Swiss-Prot record:
Presence of keyword Cytoplasm: yes
Enzymatic reactions: ATP + H2O + a folded polypeptide = ADP + phosphate + an unfolded polypeptide
Keyword line: ATP-binding, Chaperone, Cytoplasm, Isomerase, Nucleotide-binding
Gene3D superfamilies the record matches: GroEL, GroEL-like equatorial domain, TCP-1-like chaperonin intermediate domain
Catalytic EC class: isomerase
Region called Disordered, residue ranges: 526-550
Chief localization: cytoplasm
Name by which UniProt lists this protein: Chaperonin GroEL
Amino acid sequence: MAAKDVKFGNEARVKMLRGVNVLADAVKVTLGPKGRNVVLDKSFGAPSITKDGVSVAREIELEDKFENMGAQMVKEVASKANDAAGDGTTTATLLAQAIVNEGLKAVAAGMNPMDLKRGIDKAVISAVEELRIMSVPCADSKAITQVGTISANADEKVGSLIADAMDKVGKDGVITVEEGTGLQDELEVVKGMQFDRGYLSPYFINKPETGIVELENPYILMADKKISNVRELLPILEAVAKSGKPLLIISEDLEGEALATLVVNSMRGIVKVAAVKAPGFGDRRKAMLQDISILTSGSVISEELAMELEKSTLEDLGQAKRVVINKDTTTIIGGIGEKYNIQSRISQIRQQIQEATSDYDKEKLNERLAKLSGGVAVLKVGAATEVEMKEKKARVEDALHATRAAVEEGVVPGGGVALVRVAAKISNIVGQNEDQNVGIRVALRAMEAPLRQIVSNSGEEPSVVTNNVKDGKGNYGYNAATDEYGDMISFGILDPTKVTRSALQYASSVAGLMITTECMVTDLPKDEKSDLGNSSAPSAGGMGGMGGMM
């Protein structure tokens, strides 16, 4: 076991604080409409430029191990805020820095660290409750556009694109961000249910000019099994041929004789048919087949339910207005499923999302939810260079997370005003002793930090502006972009309540732990001289051997 370096008390806290300040100072220059960029060097390729707090935080690793521990703990604040709300990482880092700095001053002055932490926690609990009271719903496209614009660094085009995407696919719809091929940002909307499985044979293609299969008003056969024997399919093929409608087969796999027969029937025009593999794997495949069956009002032919393919009838088949298949994807448009059944399935998936523990499971459940809800929107980001593309894509993703958070929990006045107003409202709370009261005051002072930093980054005097804002009421605040005072809601400067709440909660949690730290332990650095001495010994022996041979 490696020898350890141990530091206690003030010596440990000073080192830790230095690390906190290095990371936070690098992150906070990005805050606000006039925040600056940070250039990040990469071990390969061109440097990247970002205005995203968590991206800056993730790159910072300090040489001094004790300082690095402080930096890593604040990095955790940014990461947690990012995971919870997808935005607000710079605000969270700034709040943590403010609480740690003020808190450690109080500890140095002789206050009890545990009581300080209790006071901070008490203030934060009250502040979160006040934020919820202050919050207003974010229901209309205008508010969504404003939230997206602010989070995308005052890029109105991005804000309106996100609002447009939410209008088209719904609040629960899947909206993804991709790198575009041109200079302009674009929105592409895929209506209906789309999954990542293409046609099993190119011979099914009936639109050769575009290389796709298009089926109008088709029947849809869903089977949770491999199909290789054509005899299993003959009864249903004959019934579909008599109806004159096309047929889409979705199964675990379809191969050999069965696939060959379908191709021949399709090419001869006996029955217009296409086949694709079912999406997903294992239990997820079963669930997605069930989703498709509810959307199209059909049944999944499953041997687990003692159902046989040979005995299936037209009543077991789903139906849709249109199906489009290319080599990679299948899109089912206008399924005839009953709205009540679809809504019940959506509610069931929402419940599963709440109970899911892994991010991967939540992501896959959200995809299923969106496909049932109405569609998928793709935001294609345009830029002139790859460096600009990466920076812009990160901003658009932040804006998308912020708008989702706003829809979920509502919005509060932006620009740091919400926390200033909350601090004023809870200024009369008291702790059980004087040390707790100091902790409460530490938290209240820290809540002014985001406003002060926004003002500082815009080149104005933080104390003057902060006092002017504190003298006002309600939504009155400072618009750093235009250097004027007024109603922040009217200015369109809004923050999602969830983002502000998460930033405050995570910052106070980690900062409280740092304030109560009394000892820090890390590995001692290896003695480079001894390493050099050890490595030179074999080399010298080898040389001696060579001399003897000569």
